[in-house]
Amino acid sequence: MNNNFNGGNNTGNNFTGNTLSNGICTKKNMKGTLSRTAIFSDGISDDLICCLDPIYNNNDNNNDAICDELGLTPIDNNTICSTDFTPINVMRTDPFRKKSTQELTREWTEWKENSPSLFTPAIVGVVTSFLLQSLKKQATSFLLKTLTDLLFPNNSSLTMEEILRATEQYVQERLDTDTANRVSQELVGLKNNLTTFNDQVEDFLQNRVGISPLAIIDSINTMQQLFVNRLPQFQVSGYQVLLLPLFAQAATLHLTFLRDVIINADEWNIPTAQLNTYTRYFKEYIAEYSNYALSTYDDGFRTRFYPRNTLEDMLQFKTFMTLNALDLVSIWSLLKYVNLYVSTSANLYNIGDNKVNEGAYPISYGPFFNSYIQTKSNYVLSGVSGIGARFTYSTVLGRYLHDDLKNIITTYVGGTQGPNIGVQLSTTELDELKKQQQATRDSLVDFQFFTLNCMLPNPITAPYFATSLYESRYSSIGGYLRKDVFKSEDSTCGLGNPGAWTSYPDYYITNISATVQINGENTDTTPLYFKENRPITSTRGVNKVIAVYNRKANIAGTNQNGTMIHQAPPDGTGFTVSPLHPSANTITSYIKENYGNSGDSLHLKGQGYLHYMLSGNGQDRYRLVLRLSGAANQIKLQSPTTSIYAFDTSTNNEGITDNGSKFKDFAFSTPFVIPEQKEIVLYFEGVGSLDLMNLIFLPADDTPLY
């Protein structure tokens, strides 16, 4: 019997083990490998690698050709290929490296050229990545000018219209002619007004000696009114979901405009009264736009998928809307901070497209699913294993093969395992499975077991960053073959030969999970408590493998139990830590889904401790800010000992409601230094119902804008 199922370093006809795919490029003087699209640039230095599909391979210098062909105009005098360019995703060794706008544009453009089946245009990723970098103090203080150049390149509104066209393709809906014409005209008007305002600011800054600030104040007031008048044109009744990505970009332009006014108040000679007014506007519009976007997404999701639908459709909608709108919403409430590295993100997903026994899930299944794919999210992913069977059947029309993956188990650094998903079969049960197949199918002529056994050589520095998950029809007469393959910088491993890869710039795979086949026996769908290892069972086994992607990159190492240690930026920049990434906890906790929060929150009850392990340079001083929703009698920070006393955010909050969470940021008063290893210990007392949404470590001397 020929065994085509290899879990080690060999390659069989159908199942690939730890073997690198052909076509990956490396430079002899550099470490590691690059993406399939990597090419060498002939006309530049011998040490240069350019990871962009060539337009003219034989040109001595193809930068101009690439720029012209792809419509990439250098924004900050950087070329497409640069000696310090790091290929997308392959290494997680320099999380704090600043990228130029041109580099971000090139990365997301390459991603778009190679991304299967997603309608998302590259510009939405560029804008989000740029904004995340711009939250740091060393970034430009005039964000609006750069965002205008990104969203309206060459003084054209075509890029913004591309966002609308892409959303129309995804949701399979189009604006009526009158609304489409009105939106197009509004985009042109917005572009013209932004150009005029940016020019007026430039003129003022160049000729301000002896000139009254009234001119710039008039320009600011005019621009503010134009934003207020134009934003409703992207909130047309009946088309709210379709217009949401476009609204998110327009709202981001307005909020960065307000932020620029506040940050540059001294340089622009803005009076105190005017500054106070615009600070109030800033806070009010962050809340107004956030609530609109979050409620529009929630209503759209429920309308689209109620009462039940496939998880594939649900996760694709979540991923699309996260990339196109919700990532920006997550940033809006953090714009008040002037020096911050956002370390995590909402999850993106790649889910296998196999259709055998797929079934539909009620919309209420979501909290259960969201809990079991993240219940071990504070650990560092190290691999995945599983077992399955391949059946060979014979019919009068010929033979066909059929794969049946029975279970998978995810493993993490330190030996921790995630929930067993599917069905764990004993030898006796496997024999019984064979008998069942013989009794219920076409003539069974062959039967083999196979194992999935993928382990990362370097899970921290070279995690999985791409997946190829699909199921191919074996022949017209029947059968399906599984293809579930995972790619890191060091290895490619999985079942079958990979097809198109799914990855996202600056995202890494933080968990591998699966759905189970529907058969009426999946009775316990209550959400898992955090860290619970409850099996996710089905006698029919695994249906779709799922890869979970996140921006989490600043991992200094792991604790003895395998949980992650969070690296503070070396230059004293503030940073965030996800509440889902503790090193230990003794308080009853569950995962609470949030839409606009750079990830989900930890829902706490009762009293107990949460521990987080950090690593810093031993010099920079920080204050800890907790983003909280709910009520508690006291939260105590140990070392230094300081407390947040009784609070209730139901009446005292930021004015934003995120899937039921009404939050406020609370700061501990005592600053502290983060040495090479520092444990943050939080004690929660008298908690009735509390969402811990974010931990924000601010530079001790920094003050929020409001």
From Swiss-Prot:
Keywords: Sporulation, Toxin, Virulence
Matches recorded under InterPro entries: Galactose-bd-like_sf, Pest_crys, Pest_crys_dom-III, Pest_crys_dom_I, Pest_crys_N_sf, Pest_cryst_cen_dom_Cry2A/18, Pest_cryst_cen_dom_sf
GO terms, molecular function: signaling receptor binding; toxin activity
BP terms from Gene Ontology: sporulation resulting in formation of a cellular spore; symbiont-mediated killing of host cell
Protein family (similarity comment): Belongs to the delta endotoxin family.
Its biological purpose: Binds to the brush border membrane vesicles of scarab larvae and somehow damages the gut wall to allow the vegetative cells of P.popilliae to enter the hemolymph. Active on M.melolontha.
Identification of the protein by name: Parasporal crystal protein Cry18Aa
Organism, as annotated: Paenibacillus popilliae
Lineage: Bacteria, Bacillati, Bacillota, Bacilli, Bacillales
